[in-house]
Amino acid sequence: MKALKASIRVAVTALALSLSFAAPSHAEEDEAGALTRQMKQLYRAGKYTEALPLAQKSLALREKEFGPDDANVAMPLNDLGTIQYNLGQYAVAEPLYKRALAIREKTLGADHAEVAMVLNNLGDLYRAEERYAEAEPLLKRSIAIGEKTNDPSMVLALSNLGAVYSNQGRYDQAVPLFKRGLAVLEKALGPDDPEATVLMNNLADAYINRHRYADAERLLKRSIAVTEKAFGPDHPDVAQAQNNLAALYARQGRNAEAERLFKRSAAAMEKTLGPNHPDLAGVLENLAGLYRDQGRYADAQQTLKRSMAIRAKTRPI
């Protein structure tokens, strides 16, 4: 069973930074600001499809006002890239991140915290595409900038580098990164802040693969409870943690519990992310594996066929 590696990507949480570089006309500034606020709310609620046109319009306004390579355009590029990433549109997200990175390096210098932000996001995109050799140096560079500038947001890259290692079975390297990141977030935000649940999921997955099942179950249940309280039962992060908990139950032979959670996870992902998202394909693959292990071959074949159809639509070209 595959657990879905959670990841942290900076998007609308830092949008206000882009407003300080210049003084655009009041009409367009007001419109862009309103779009930004709406997009932030939708993004945090996991409503990425609804956030997408707002991000696209915000970017268009910035480009019209400042030109395509101005510093004010970098944040809208980054945010649109992150929303496309969350929609599974990796090939669309990559050039947006690369443009944002080039602008920030040119205007802010190579060691600025906002450069580290985009390095993290691009590195995590490569992780999602299993381009680990490209992801690792970007995430390490992001961490190095954070350490140099004493920026606590380096926890983002710590988590995602840990996910790169975990995806490759390098759990002894992943666990310390997850623990370090989780400690930083809990100290800064408190033990029940939903921002910390991403690291809970990643650390739990590493524990599963090291056969520390009780520790993993505790973290995943906590992650589900915190995220449901903050965002409701259909949020993508809830679905992701449910998938991971189901994978744990499947390993333990708790098949009925695993099937129930896989189905809940798939239903929530389809509702919030759409029927063709890569994360949904991952849950369906896990459910198909559970069916196969129980000798339910017709169910397994039907479920796997659906997953393969999603993969064919979303696989990078």
Question: Which residues does each predicted region cover?
Answer:
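Intrinsic-disorder-linked linear interaction elements in eukaryotic regulatory proteins
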Residues: 1-317
